[in-house]
Swiss-Prot record:
The keyword Cytoplasm applies. It comes from Aliivibrio salmonicida (strain LFI1238) (Vibrio salmonicida (strain LFI1238)). It is found in: Cytoplasm. The gene is bioH. Belongs to the AB hydrolase superfamily. Carboxylesterase BioH family. This is Pimeloyl-[acyl-carrier protein] methyl ester esterase. Its EC number is 3.1.1.85. It comes from the Bacteria. The active site is at S82 (nucleophile), D207, H235.
Length: 261
């Protein structure tokens, strides 16, 4: 069965797909879409179970990737934030001819911590899963707060994310639960060497969900990739440091151009 996700397309230029993270929806990109649309044809999606795709319910990891690929442009750059980074990476591995460049933001091929690998402790993920059953709205709000922790403008960042996300229908609780399972279980580390397109990895140095050590450990997994660290950012650098973020993104996507914001 083909399931149609909700997409928005704005601007003119080369195609750029933006994929949101857990508990969020495509509206989270709106502040930067306005700036990017002067240079790119920007495609934002609400993943299955989120925003205007909430009624589609839950989809597992491979289904989510297939759903996005089914409606994405024939060939474009893909940018995934957090959980969206896993989806963008898997799409690049599954259909390398469709992904011209891969950008991951505040993402990790393995979100869960384990011996020798920094990440989210399994107890924290379990706690979120339990809290979801009691009050999923409050759980998503807590997650937003966790994302902005460490950022100098944390309160402002949370407010902006919340406003954008709450402008669309609430996420489907089963999709939220599936998303946490993906964050707990998926491990793409051993597949990363198969990536054939240019890769850019962006991180916030103060990120509490994707520790900065992951950024450095990843150098060994994708040695020829571009690494960008936003020194004062946490988990959402495209919100807290949008101008710097867009400059770095453009530098990677179109290195021959000078970009004026």
């Amino acid at each position: 069965m083909t399931t149609s996700l909700y997409w928005q397309t704005e601007g003119e230029g080369s195609d750029l797909v933006l994929i949101h993270g857990w508990g969020m929806n495509g509206a989270v990109w709106q502040p930067i879409v306005e700036k990017l649309s002067s240079q790119y044809r920007v495609h934002t999606v609400d993943l299955s179970g989120y925003g205007y795709s909430a009624e589609l319910g839950s989809a597992d990891f491979d289904e989510m990737v297939a759903q996005v690929l089914a409606q994405a442009p024939e060939k474009s750059a893909w940018l995934g934030w957090s959980l969206g980074g896993l989806i963008a990476t898997q799409a690049a591995l599954t259909a390398p001819d469709r992904v011209s460049q891969l950008i991951t933001v505040a993402s990790s091929p393995r979100f869960a911590a384990e011996k020798g690998w920094r990440g989210i402790k399994s107890a924290v993920l379990s706690q979120f899963t339990e809290q979801l059953k009691e009050d999923f709205t409050l759980t998503v709000e807590r997650f937003m707060t966790l994302q902005a922790m460490g950022s100098p403008n944390a309160k402002q960042d949370i407010k902006q994310v919340k406003r954008a996300v709450l402008s669309r229908p609430a996420p489907n609780p089963s999709a939220l639960a599936t998303g946490l399972t993906i964050l707990a279980d998926i491990d793409l580390r051993e597949s990363l060497s198969q990536l054939t397109m240019p890769v850019c990895r962006m991180y916030g140095r103060l990120d509490g969900l994707v520790p900065i050590k992951v950024a450095h450990d990843m150098d060994a997994f994708i040695p020829h990739s571009t690494k960008v660290v936003f020194e004062q950012a946490s988990h959402a650098p495209f919100i807290s440091h949008s101008d710097e973020f867009i400059t770095e993104l453009h530098r990677f996507l179109q290195p021959e151009d000078e970009f004026l914001i």
